[in-house]
């Protein structure tokens, strides 16, 4: 058990003019897709008592769901809170709420830094958000309240989906047990804990009934799903059960730690037609020296072996990964191991970011911190290489047919994604059609041209599913 502070400012007189049920609520969600799910749950909990608006300028209550993962994310969160604080002067905002990882980590500092914040919530306080707002408005609370909570808690419940209606994320677990030396997430989010399978299936069924065609499974480590509550890893069973839901056409899995990918999971990916042949595998580095310093539970040999197995057993598999460059003590030789690895194995989707020295992490205290200029140069070199690899891979797609999940029309052409493309992070397929096509439909498209990352195609069948 631990205590989470909910800081409530004293200047509440201005909020007594109207009943809370008349207020409009606007949400600004920052950070990862797991944070987005939290934002959707918050809106779901508030939707019966408040009117939801997607324009903060029209909102009486503004919620900023922050990210506190790396320095740039923290700065973006602070800048956004300050921007929304100005809405209390220039627009309708009467109540500013900050929540999420940054407030969980830096609640006291934020209270001093940004006194315009009226309420601060930690990452597990969402169940009481309506009660807290009502008490604040009614003036019945003192400046500070303490809530006890167990890190067994998982935020669940009704959601207001904020993504394209044809796709939605489903968080299957909360927290993390990995304790990588550069990462603060386990201290913020707590230990790894899986959701019950029946709750996930019910949520997926509800999403399907609302028109969702693609569900994207997320967690800090999806491959560990079930190990804590069922006694063994059970992601393959979850995939099998989810694929039985009528209306769900694609099931995508993100955040699979390489050392936890297991045979039954690979078999299910290979054999289940609804499970797209796409895995997000956060490798982070390929040098054994750096992997050890990062506290990763794998090795270069094991990573390469897992990639080879996946490609042998699932020939059409698309692998996405990320690398951290400029980690403490990373030499040119260590960095070049990543470069050589990418040249040889040509992963389809790669992202990179520079190491961020996060306080309260072991890596922050390591000797051998790398200059920012060197970090940025390594990131630039890596992404330039990957751009060339992506162009090479894309050229091989010319003439191929893909089922495309349509996501919209930009005024000139339609756009959507093949199974090789995850929402928000990957490219699109652009195509024209004489017929009107609705979002969420599947069409068969032949690729005729490539861009740096996007593909251009022509429709050969305007209703393939």
Swiss-Prot record:
<dbReference type="GO" id="GO:0035599">
    <property type="term" value="F:aspartic acid methylthiotransferase activity"/>
</dbReference>
<keyword id="KW-0963">Cytoplasm</keyword>
<feature type="domain" description="TRAM">
    <location>
        <begin position="395"/>
        <end position="461"/>
    </location>
</feature>
<keyword id="KW-0808">Transferase</keyword>
<dbReference type="GO" id="GO:0051539">
    <property type="term" value="F:4 iron, 4 sulfur cluster binding"/>
</dbReference>
<dbReference type="Pfam" id="PF00919">
    <property type="entry name" value="UPF0004"/>
</dbReference>
<protein>
    <recommendedName>
        <fullName>Ribosomal protein uS12 methylthiotransferase RimO</fullName>
        <ecNumber>2.8.4.4</ecNumber>
    </recommendedName>
</protein>
<feature type="binding site">
    <location>
        <position position="183"/>
    </location>
    <ligand>
        <name>[4Fe-4S] cluster 2</name>
    </ligand>
</feature>
<dbReference type="InterPro" id="IPR012340">
    <property type="entry name" value="NA-bd_OB-fold"/>
</dbReference>
<dbReference type="Pfam" id="PF04055">
    <property type="entry name" value="Radical_SAM"/>
</dbReference>
<dbReference type="GO" id="GO:0103039">
    <property type="term" value="F:protein methylthiotransferase activity"/>
</dbReference>
<keyword id="KW-0949">S-adenosyl-L-methionine</keyword>
<comment type="function">
    <text>Catalyzes the methylthiolation of an aspartic acid residue of ribosomal protein uS12.</text>
</comment>
<dbReference type="InterPro" id="IPR007197">
    <property type="entry name" value="rSAM"/>
</dbReference>
<keyword id="KW-0004">4Fe-4S</keyword>
<feature type="binding site">
    <location>
        <position position="180"/>
    </location>
    <ligand>
        <name>[4Fe-4S] cluster 2</name>
    </ligand>
</feature>
<keyword id="KW-0411">Iron-sulfur</keyword>
<keyword id="KW-0479">Metal-binding</keyword>
<dbReference type="GO" id="GO:0046872">
    <property type="term" value="F:metal ion binding"/>
</dbReference>
<dbReference type="InterPro" id="IPR020612">
    <property type="entry name" value="Methylthiotransferase_CS"/>
</dbReference>
<comment type="similarity">
    <text>Belongs to the methylthiotransferase family. RimO subfamily.</text>
</comment>
<dbReference type="InterPro" id="IPR023404">
    <property type="entry name" value="rSAM_horseshoe"/>
</dbReference>
<feature type="binding site">
    <location>
        <position position="67"/>
    </location>
    <ligand>
        <name>[4Fe-4S] cluster 1</name>
    </ligand>
</feature>
<feature type="binding site">
    <location>
        <position position="176"/>
    </location>
    <ligand>
        <name>[4Fe-4S] cluster 2</name>
    </ligand>
</feature>
<dbReference type="GO" id="GO:0006400">
    <property type="term" value="P:tRNA modification"/>
</dbReference>
<feature type="binding site">
    <location>
        <position position="101"/>
    </location>
    <ligand>
        <name>[4Fe-4S] cluster 1</name>
    </ligand>
</feature>
<feature type="binding site">
    <location>
        <position position="32"/>
    </location>
    <ligand>
        <name>[4Fe-4S] cluster 1</name>
    </ligand>
</feature>
<dbReference type="InterPro" id="IPR013848">
    <property type="entry name" value="Methylthiotransferase_N"/>
</dbReference>
<dbReference type="InterPro" id="IPR002792">
    <property type="entry name" value="TRAM_dom"/>
</dbReference>
<dbReference type="InterPro" id="IPR006638">
    <property type="entry name" value="Elp3/MiaA/NifB-like_rSAM"/>
</dbReference>
<dbReference type="InterPro" id="IPR005840">
    <property type="entry name" value="Ribosomal_uS12_MeSTrfase_RimO"/>
</dbReference>
<dbReference type="Pfam" id="PF18693">
    <property type="entry name" value="TRAM_2"/>
</dbReference>
<dbReference type="InterPro" id="IPR005839">
    <property type="entry name" value="Methylthiotransferase"/>
</dbReference>
<dbReference type="InterPro" id="IPR038135">
    <property type="entry name" value="Methylthiotransferase_N_sf"/>
</dbReference>
<feature type="domain" description="Radical SAM core">
    <location>
        <begin position="162"/>
        <end position="392"/>
    </location>
</feature>
<keyword id="KW-0408">Iron</keyword>
<feature type="domain" description="MTTase N-terminal">
    <location>
        <begin position="23"/>
        <end position="138"/>
    </location>
</feature>
<dbReference type="GO" id="GO:0005829">
    <property type="term" value="C:cytosol"/>
</dbReference>
